[in-house]
């Protein structure tokens, strides 16, 4: 009888656990920020589970350790394509369809005109949710005042030679497309004009 009682309690607790996990929690900027600073949460396997993906300006020839081009190092100006939007040429940095969140965006530039416009389109909308000069979006004051979630490093380095970081989570329910517009870019993979290096998680 004792074993039966233990079995009933175990089944009951298991059902509560399953039912609890069936409840969908809304993923928002607020929930993601809370997750980032909750030390207890960091020690547990995430629920709902997720995968970390990265898009970057990595040299597309570097695909496999077995390849002769594994050490190809033209890790700049490698975009997914080009969109023409209202007469603008927007280079595509990221175009993801499943639900997710941008949790880290790093970029650095060379021969930068300081006029490049970054746009983040969320959930198939034609109007960007975020739009502004690249470095002001990442480490300036467009999304956040100066703080730990948006920094350019190192302060000892000339501003345009720094790495610019944004850790403010930006969730999306359907899709996210990130584009970059700059008249100083000379095309995909072309390094004769402005140069952009980036990583987005």
Name what the model sees in each region.
Residues 10-19:
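Hydrophobic h-region of N-terminal signal peptides that target proteins for export
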Residues 21-201:
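Beta-strand-centric surfaces of beta-sandwich/beta-rich domains
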Residues 8-9, 55:
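A ubiquitous, low-specificity "background" feature that marks scattered single residues
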Residues 1-8:
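Bacterial N-terminal signal peptides that target proteins for export
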């Amino acid at each position: 009888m004792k074993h039966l009682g233990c079995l009933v309690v175990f089944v009951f607790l298991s059902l509560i656990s399953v039912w609890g996990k069936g409840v969908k929690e809304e993923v928002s900027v607020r929930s993601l920020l809370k997750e980032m600073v909750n030390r207890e949460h960091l020690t547990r396997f995430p629920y709902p589970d997720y995968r970390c993906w990265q898009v970057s300006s990595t040299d597309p020839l570097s695909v496999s350790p077995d390849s002769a081009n594994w050490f190809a190092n033209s890790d700049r100006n490698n975009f997914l394509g080009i969109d023409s939007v209202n007469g603008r040429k927007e280079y595509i940095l990221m175009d993801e369809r499943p639900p997710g969140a941008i949790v880290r965006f790093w970029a650095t530039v060379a021969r930068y005109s300081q006029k490049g416009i970054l746009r983040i389109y969320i959930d198939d909308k034609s109007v960007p949710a975020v739009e502004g000069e690249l470095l002001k979006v990442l480490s300036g004051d467009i999304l956040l005042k100066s703080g730990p979630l948006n920094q350019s490093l190192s302060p000892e380095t000339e501003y345009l030679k720094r790495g610019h970081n944004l850790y403010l989570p930006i969730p999306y329910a359907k899709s996210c497309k990130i584009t970059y517009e700059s008249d100083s870019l000379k095309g995909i993979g072309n390094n004769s004009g402005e140069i952009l290096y980036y990583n987005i998680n």
